[in-house]
């Protein structure tokens, strides 16, 4: 059976009710929200993997607080055995699917194939990468994928593949596997993926490749100290600034958001950024036609001046004209509820950089 919503946490499952037959009309097992008296017909489907089994246990615990102690019924015991068996079987099946995908991806590229054959080969490889991305949203599968040397294949061959469709799917899969998993992040960093991803973000001709490369970079540096240190050594902040200056809206928004988050999480790098001229470049971006990404640019500026006198001094440089720009932007935003956070950043910058202790001219 197809399992809709199988990505991430699978099937919200609960144990079959204990023999007292009490029932909550909780959100719907497979079509019968009515009485639960008809034997085991209301039993939920067993989970397909260990993550689903864990979810089942959590759900059961939350739905039946402080159950009275009682012997486990034979029906309940049998159901649990079947659920555990199905979970392990489902995990094995998904590992086999990953192995099958890796066999496709490990094949050498057809050197002198005709156009139709090349297109079919690329389509098969793209399909394998997409299936892997779906499977690897489950952290157990992501770990198995890396143990099968899948990450070596992605970094070594597919980030630099000739077809853009292969490059962006490889970058997306790297990000999906790495997200919030320190051991996988360390493996990816050790393979030299960050340098290649920054190059894709900076130079690739395909916008989708650049957006997916940025996603993978974010997954490797936001909560990973070793990744951030590599990012600094590879001049990643300059690459990020150039991405914000592009005409691709999604790239601008995501780049500015990552910069803002890195500054909030790692204020110790503010001096480095100021010495790179980051204040001047961010102000220049705020002067461009108004866009949703300005919120994150102004948020980054706020992080550069909060409790940091060097950033305040640079914002006060008369040639920047930042005070006038901020006051004009406040007037523009006051009537727009959807820009409330951007307005607050403008007001904070005015207060921090341009208000003397006796100046209370911040009235809106």
Curated annotation (Swiss-Prot):
InterPro entries linked to this entry: ARM-like, ARM-type_fold, Hsp70_NEF-Inhibitors, Nucleotide_exch_fac_Fes1
The ARM repeat ranges on this chain: 137-179, 182-222, 225-264, 267-306
Species of origin: Macaca fascicularis
Subunit structure: Interacts with the ATP-binding domain of HSPA1A. Detected in a ternary complex containing STUB1, HSPA1A and HSPBP1. Interacts with PGLYRP1; this interaction blocks the cytotoxic activity of the PGLYRP1-HSPA1A complex.
Pfam families: Fes1 (PF08609)
Keywords recorded for this protein, A-Z: Phosphoprotein, Repeat
Gene transcribed to yield this protein: HSPBP1
Function: Inhibits HSPA1A chaperone activity by changing the conformation of the ATP-binding domain of HSPA1A and interfering with ATP binding. Interferes with ubiquitination mediated by STUB1 and inhibits chaperone-assisted degradation of target proteins.
GO molecular function: adenyl-nucleotide exchange factor activity
UniProt name for this protein: Hsp70-binding protein 1
Region of interest called Disordered, as start-end residue ranges on this chain: 1-75
In-chain residues carrying the UniProt-annotated modification Phosphoserine: 356, 361
Composition skew (Gly residues), residue ranges: 23-42
GO cellular component: endoplasmic reticulum
């Amino acid at each position: 059976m197809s399992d809709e919503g199988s990505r991430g946490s699978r099937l919200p499952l609960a144990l079959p009710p204990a023999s007292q037959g009490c029932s909550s009309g909780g959100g719907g097992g497979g079509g019968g929200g009515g009485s639960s008296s008809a034997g085991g017909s209301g039993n939920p489907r067993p989970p397909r993997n260990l993550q689903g089994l864990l979810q089942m246990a959590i759900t059961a615990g939350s739905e039946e607080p402080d159950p009275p102690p009682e012997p486990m019924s034979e029906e309940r015991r049998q159901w649990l055995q079947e659920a555990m068996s199905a979970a392990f079987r489902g995990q094995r099946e998904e590992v086999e699917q990953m192995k099958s995908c890796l066999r496709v991806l490990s094949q050498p590229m057809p050197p002198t194939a005709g156009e139709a054959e090349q297109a079919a080969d690329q389509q098969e490889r793209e399909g394998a990468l997409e299936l892997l991305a779906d499977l690897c949203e489950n952290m157990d599968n992501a770990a198995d994928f890396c143990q099968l040397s899948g990450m070596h294949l992605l970094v070594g061959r597919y980030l630099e593949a000739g077809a853009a469709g292969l490059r962006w799917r490889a970058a997306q899969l790297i990000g999906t596997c790495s997200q919030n998993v320190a051991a996988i992040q360390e493996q990816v960093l050790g393979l030299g993926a960050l340098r290649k991803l920054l190059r894709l973000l900076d130079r690739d001709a395909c916008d989708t490749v650049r957006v997916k490369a940025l996603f993978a970079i974010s997954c490797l540096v936001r909560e990973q100290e070793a990744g951030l240190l590599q990012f600094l050594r590879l001049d990643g902040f300059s690459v990020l600034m150039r991405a914000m200056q592009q005409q691709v809206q999604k790239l601008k928004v995501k780049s500015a958001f990552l910069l803002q988050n890195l500054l909030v999480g790692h204020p110790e790098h503010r001096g480095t950024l100021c010495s790179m001229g980051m204040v001047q470049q961010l102000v220049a971006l705020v002067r461009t036609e108004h866009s949703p990404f300005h919120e994150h640019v102004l948020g980054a500026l706020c992080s550069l001046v909060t409790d940091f006198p060097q950033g305040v001094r640079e914002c006060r440089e008369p040639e920047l004209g930042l005070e006038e720009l901020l006051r004009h932007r406040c007037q523009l935003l006051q009537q727009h509820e959807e820009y409330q956070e951007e307005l607050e950043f403008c007001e904070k910058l005015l207060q921090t950089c341009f208000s003397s202790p006796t100046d209370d001219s911040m009235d809106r």
